[in-house]
Amino acid sequence: MLLFQKTLSRVAAPISVAANLILILLIIFKSPAQMGNYKYLLIGLSIFEMSYAVLDVVSETTVLSIKKSFVVVVPYKDRSFGQETAMDINLIYCGFFGFSMGMFVVIFAYRSFLTTGNTILRKFEGFKIISWFAYPLFYAIVWILVAWGPLASFPEMDIVVRPFLLDELNMTVDEVAYTGRLFYSTIDNSLRYSAILTGVLQWVLTASSLFLVIFFGLRCYFHYGKLVQLTDVQSIRLRQLQNQLFLALVCQATVPLILMHIPVTILYTCCVLNIVFNPFSVATTIALFPAIDPLPTIFIVKNYRVALFEFVCPSCLCWSETLKHMGSNRITSYRSNTVNALSM
């Protein structure tokens, strides 16, 4: 199973890099003028996802469920770096997970402010939009500090982890760098409050990010309903673009929700209930996230989809346009014949 996970990561990483590079080029050269600074947020998201994919391959991270605990493991046995570097990679990996939670809040918030005409966006014109990344960076810092402090390895944890590392990875605690949460002490079965409190903190941040995504998403949705009443050509085009971007954003936000946040939430719950959760499902689904996430924007936004088809298969696009014109002519002819028949 570990071999499958490594293979999947090595396959998903180049797909992620290629897909996100394509999306970045499409955003730079094929974005409608109405997108404004929103395109910089999308570029930032693509850069983050490429970095996540590369980190996943470099780290070879594994998540092990160990009844009352779980551990994030970065092996350094027979590799070009030692324990200290492996621990740094482990912390960065945890930070990237936290960053992903805050990132979609920022994008949904920007779309909400943009569609409702909030004047606050005028303060972030041009490259000032980069300051919006401070919010997901805050999430990343919290996850890193929690992993570095309360979730760092300690002697009691080593005793718990040692047999599982040997069985699952054929490694010892001296050949890996790991972070993990031990909810119950193995000595007297008492609660470890440092693990509980930091778990509550991370749960609150996770729940708040989900709440904000839903809140800003609903604001966008209800405002789009008002755009339906506008009938001039420019407003119709704007409405179509806004709908495409919103649908793409919803799909993009659903991908990490299904592949990352729900599995990790289940993992936390299983640890509290002393249930072993499939150790490879979490790391495997996380590896898929950066490869799948850019696809909705590429194929839902018309400008990007058409530009990609023009490059990959120009003849296919020509046939599509021909069929579209043929269908349009038939409808026009049918309407004309119907009107003539009624007039007679």
Swiss-Prot record:
GO molecular function: G protein-coupled olfactory receptor activity
Knockout or disruption consequences: Lack of sensitivity of ADL neurons to N,N-diethyl-meta-toluamide (DEET) with no effect on average pause length of worms following DEET exposure in contrast to wild-type worms which show a marked increase. Does not affect AWC neuron activity in response to DEET.
Membrane topology: Multi-pass membrane protein
A single Gene Ontology CC term: plasma membrane
Single GO biological process annotation from the record: response to insecticide
Record family assignment: Belongs to the nematode receptor-like protein str family.
Name of the featured protein: G-protein coupled receptor str-217
Gene encoding the protein: str-217
